[in-house]
Amino acid sequence: MDLTVEPNLHSLITSTTHKWIFVGGKGGVGKTTSSCSIAIQMALSQPNKQFLLISTDPAHNLSDAFGEKFGKDARKVTGMNNLSCMEIDPSAALKDMNDMAVSRANNNGSDGQGDDLGSLLQGGALADLTGSIPGIDEALSFMEVMKHIKRQEQGEGETFDTVIFDTAPTGHTLRFLQLPNTLSKLLEKFGEITNKLGPMLNSFMGAGNVDISGKLNELKANVETIRQQFTDPDLTTFVCVCISEFLSLYETERLIQELISYDMDVNSIIVNQLLFAENDQEHNCKRCQARWKMQKKYLDQIDELYEDFHVVKMPLCAGEIRGLNNLTKFSQFLNKEYNPITDGKVIYELEDKE
């Protein structure tokens, strides 16, 4: 019985159960190109389903990758009717929070105290304060996920069968994935406090008839739903992206161990920017040969360390992989592994930018 794991993502691309797919790794290894490629291939292979690609990276490269502007609201990729993109903007989300707080303070200003609070918050004071909190980007990204789940459950707006996350570099991503457990513990403590001090807190905060305990319980239930889904291998998986160099391999191993500690499924690695040995002299200089020799050394280590993973080896292309056309050409090698002999010409077809 052949137990060899396929060196491609065909099983993931054709999966009908996955709701959440995270794509992450060290900075500069091609995470955005990889996440765009996965999203495109899934959309092409399952035309009757809707897919959403979300950037949780503050750098926001989806617009650059596709060559069109995306924002905080999901918008279809031009040329595809079942793939949408959105870029979570923490600064815009903080401004919305600040405006909401100003409105709330002004509405509760009948006793004169709300006017003072409203004046204090005018000019973005809340946004300035919270914007400096470590991990706020990850928290806001997590809030967007929660809002998306709630809209899906209530049948509001467009529904998506699968959400692909183009994540921030490793440290940010790990903080993001820790949030369900962290929030669950935090809300447990808040629940104990509000059960004892709920009426006093309502009075102090001018919350009127707002049931703080009820709101916390609702939030806790939503967080628990996400935690359960993120740890279900049929619903969620993480695709690691790296290049064939020591530091990238080291960080990939650290990332995988962390993901395992979170009980999150991880069984795929995309190795980008591989030169591959070429037979023709025109494209096989001494520097290329030396670099391929170095890459091959770490590739052998990856194959040995992760023999039960889908290890996808992607070529370094002659030009930038930008625009839907180039991304589609490149992404085919996630579904069917790249062969330097038969597919080598494709990497030079991408030499001219769209």
From Swiss-Prot:
Domain of life: Eukaryota
Keyword annotations from UniProtKB, A to Z: Arsenical resistance, ATP-binding, Cytoplasm, Endoplasmic reticulum, ER-Golgi transport, Golgi apparatus, Hydrolase, Metal-binding, Nucleotide-binding, Transport, Zinc
Signal peptide annotation: none
Active site: D57
One Pfam family this sequence matches: ArsA_ATPase
Single biological process term from Gene Ontology: cellular response to oxidative stress
Binding site for ATP: 26-33, 245, 272, 315-322
GO molecular function: ATP binding; ATP hydrolysis activity; guanyl-nucleotide exchange factor activity; identical protein binding; metal ion binding; protein folding chaperone; unfolded protein binding
GO cellular component: cytosol; endoplasmic reticulum; endoplasmic reticulum membrane; GET complex; Golgi apparatus
Residue positions binding Zn(2+): C285, C288
Subcellular location(s) per record: Cytoplasm; Endoplasmic reticulum; Golgi apparatus
E.C. number(s) listed in UniProt: 3.6.-.-
Consequence recorded when altering G30R: Abolishes ATPase activity, leading to secretion of resident ER proteins
Main localization (coarse): cytoplasm
Family: Belongs to the arsA ATPase family.
Assembly and interaction partners: Homodimer. Component of the Golgi to ER traffic (GET) complex, which is composed of GET1, GET2 and GET3. Within the complex, GET1 and GET2 form a heterotetramer which is stabilized by phosphatidylinositol binding and which binds to the GET3 homodimer. Interacts with the chloride channel protein GEF1.
Reported function: ATPase required for the post-translational delivery of tail-anchored (TA) proteins to the endoplasmic reticulum. Recognizes and selectively binds the transmembrane domain of TA proteins in the cytosol. This complex then targets to the endoplasmic reticulum by membrane-bound receptors GET1 and GET2, where the tail-anchored protein is released for insertion. This process is regulated by ATP binding and hydrolysis. ATP binding drives the homodimer towards the closed dimer state, facilitating recognition of newly synthesized TA membrane proteins. ATP hydrolysis is required for insertion.
Miscellaneous comment as given in the Swiss-Prot or TrEMBL entry: Present with 17300 molecules/cell in log phase SD medium.
Name under which the protein is recorded: ATPase GET3
UniProt organism field: Saccharomyces cerevisiae (strain ATCC 204508 / S288c) (Baker's yeast)
Gene name for this UniProt entry: GET3
